[in-house]
Amino acid sequence: MEAITKNGSLSQTLVHCGPKSLSSFIPVRCLRFSKNPFPKKLVVTRARTSINSDHEAANRPLFQFPPSLLDDRFLSISANQSEIDSLGRDIEALKAKVSEKLVCMDVKERIHLIHLLVSLGVAYHFEKQIEEFLKVDFENVEDMNLGEEDMYSISVIFRVFRLYRHKLSSDVFNRFKEENGDFKKCLLDDKKSLTKQWASRGNTWNYFVGGSNEEHLSGHIKNVLYLSQQENAEVVMSREYIQFYEQETHHDETLLKFAKINFKFMQLHYVQELQTIVKWWKELDLESKIPNYYRVRAVECLYWAMAVYMEPQYSVARIILSKSLVLWTIIDDLYDAYCTLPEAIAFTENMERWETDAIDMPDHMKVLLRSLIDLMEDFKGEVRSEGRLYSVEYGIDEWKRLFRADLTISKWARTGYIPNYDEYMEVGIVTGGVDVTVAFAFIGMGEAGKEAFDWIRSRPKFIQTIDLKSRLRDDVATYKDEMARGEIATGINCYMKQYKVTEEEAFLEFHRRIKHTSKLVNEEYFKTTVPLKLVRIAFNVGRVIDTNYKHGDGLTYTGIVGGQITSLFLDLITI
């Protein structure tokens, strides 16, 4: 078929997207990302290659994916609406008592309480109150920390202020360090403080070794070492912390009861949402309409959405995001693991035109694209009464940008081309899908106005840095599988080619860059001026990638996150 050239037409050559090269990714802070790395339109003048030829079909990059977690255990669970309503009334009664505590405490006590509210997953009930208190308290933070020698207290203060975008310097920990930068040896037995310091900063753990005499503290430490608070999903951390807090000797019974009731309230909402998504998936009936080349990830995609926003008021938003992720996974697998190059070109062309029949392609691909188009129409129905149709149009534009990038990767894989690392990253930061995920996360949020979507489209450094970190995580986690299905244009391979290093050296460098970009994400978190709630959504999308890819490809090999998913859906918290 014709290829993409400077004026937007198609040819058999590779797609050229954005600037020809990026500056070196060392250091990453010097990187300047293109705001428009892909041509806005792809235009086909005529098709010259049959997309159904036997030769092409014989060269499909077939790959057998592991099954979904969605089995009878998940399909059999249900939520009683009367129980949800009863829990809601209990929450309102307890919320008033907790709110009184916030008002009556002195500054340090209040910050410790805010830390508990965040850790227990109930801070969202008091967001406005908390933000107002911290705005005033931060003006006196130096006096608050003066003479404070309790490392646990300093760690709590540090975490709370930074979480609410008050940039408290990590220099507050210098008082606990030797001249060489190590923590004082006398602190090494204070496991709780060191755990909190590690969790709040997300730094490499160099100081704590050995076990704990307190079993529940030992379990908490293991959780933090597996995924720090900067990396883990809030909903998972809340579930873990409630269990930890219950075993603390001096826990507050009112807070504990409030947290348990609130979490079960959320869990029952998640169960209802899963039922909605499963019903939609069954009615879609893609399993009988398209070849079985793809991952079915309904419950896993809802878990992703829960990690982006866990609050009950975002139930519709989670359903919108989950459905989008389910279809994206299937289309991503179409490009990566099934379609031929002419088919990939045809699908992308039809996607650009937002039609199923503009360019000839197999019926199963028409069904898939029609499913996506219909889903976007459903979303328009959800936001029409709010006057936010523009939000879905922004989302559609992000789909097109994403699939143009996927086409480029497909071309590289099908032609055996290995670009240099800089060329690869221009495309790779798009195929990571952070931008499209943030866009669809915003669609269901009434508070996300046109300015929020303009912010995404401006390609702010905050999101671009999350893009980069996510791309690096994904490249490390998926390298072996991508090689197995013939995708030789991987980040690792491209880095080895450009810098003439071994595979082992490339992996070490990728891990170093992941650590470095994590610091950059934190820096940009404080520089970004859009509303805090929206910034946190983007930040949480990055956390989703950490949670699912730090220890392997959790979307493909769902056992990696199976324990977390089970704890949220199947293990309902006891009150």
Curated annotation (Swiss-Prot):
GO biological process: diterpenoid biosynthetic process; sesquiterpene biosynthetic process
Matching InterPro entries: Isoprenoid_synthase_dom_sf (IPR008949), Terpene_cyclase-like_1_C (IPR034741), Terpene_cyclase_plant_C1 (IPR044814), Terpene_synth_N (IPR001906), Terpene_synth_N_sf (IPR036965), Terpene_synthase-like (IPR050148), Terpene_synthase_metal-bd (IPR005630), Terpenoid_cyclase/PrenylTrfase (IPR008930)
UniProt: Mg(2+) 3 binding residues: D474, T478, E482
Transmembrane segments: none
A GO cellular component entry from the record: chloroplast
Residues annotated as binding Mg(2+) 2: D332, D336
Localization annotation: Plastid, Chloroplast
Keywords: Chloroplast, Lyase, Magnesium, Manganese, Metal-binding, Plastid, Transit peptide
Keyword Transit peptide in annotation: yes
GO molecular function: cyclase activity; magnesium ion binding; terpene synthase activity
Role played: Does not possess diterpene synthase activity.
Family note: Belongs to the terpene synthase family. Tpsa subfamily.
Protein name stated in the entry: Inactive terpenoid synthase 20, chloroplastic
Organism per entry: Arabidopsis thaliana (Mouse-ear cress)
